[in-house]
């Protein structure tokens, strides 16, 4: 919500200022983070007000994969530690993964959320990677089964799962301080990692989050996957046949804003095939950049309508009110 207001300080309650901005900018969803959580009661009230302001039409999401770094744990509003993905993979198995999904979904639903950007399905390809620290592990087949069961648990609690991140960060390294995130994987290498994402989608995940990994051996340059039609359109849409919602990873990452303007990044993501753009540092410039691109013919109305159809389909079929 702070992006709507153009401020840096995390918003912990919403009122007329946010209501006015939601009327000005008809966004499809709001994502909250730990900084937005001041208390359990305040969080529930904020989520409720956001839906009231928009006639219950928003996706309201958070990233919670369980474990000690859950935003509900780190903010201090919950002491209910749900098994982390790493713990699930090491000792709890498929039944534990489903139970974790149920528990995550139940907690999110308690506060009014309808989206969880989980599970993290990346295959760990090197020691110390985010996939090793927070994911299921190194085996794609095992990751696939566990991801499927987490998604089933979330879905059974009426929470939309957003499986992440494709392509995975499993072997990526960052160039310099805040530079681009590079992986030397080929398209054949990526095929070895499809299963966790595809199984999560088959189990009911409504979102696929695209990473900012640059894959020069696939593209020939260092343009991030989130801005690459070779990834989103050629692989996800055409090869996989996926017609759900594609959302970018957070666009306030240094590997994006140090290389592209807010408008360039937003338009590039839509051109590449993304449907939703997650959390830019300057929402107004991103939003207006897309409008300008449509006016100039760089983006067609047909392309925008494709994304709107995917978004409305999830909201309507799943009865997110207002659709």
Where are these regions (language model features)?
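Second-shell residues forming the walls of enzyme active-site clefts
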Residues: 30, 39-52, 58, 68-70, ...
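N-terminal hydrophobic targeting/anchoring segments and the immediately downstream early-domain regions
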Residues: 1-60, 64-74, 321
